[in-house]
């Protein structure tokens, strides 16, 4: 990427589960939090916490805070629940990413950091599995 002026990078960690979406921006080391907003902070109803609309509002808030602080570009780390649970990001992940891109922040790298076990503990559901 050729840029005429230097970019100030942060790391946007998007955790998209099926119950909520977190958009958390830190500095490059990850030690200092710049902004953290969840879908549940943006909507009234519990059922809407993980919705794409709530994730979009959360990402817009975070982007505004980043611009105040002086961050102009972000690397994105997208994460699902992982472990013994689902490894696909929830419905808010994609829209949070899109909202960050549309807000004027430059996007550096996009990485999936969902925890995948090499050999994990036993999954919830018992011997005969979940019966529908």
Swiss-Prot record:
Residues 123-132 have a biased composition (Basic residues). It is found in: Cytoplasm. GO terms for cellular component: cytosolic small ribosomal subunit; hyphal cell wall; yeast-form cell wall. One of its GO terms (molecular function) is structural constituent of ribosome. Belongs to the universal ribosomal protein uS11 family. HAMAP family: Ribosomal_uS11. This is Small ribosomal subunit protein uS11. It comes from Candida albicans (strain SC5314 / ATCC MYA-2876).
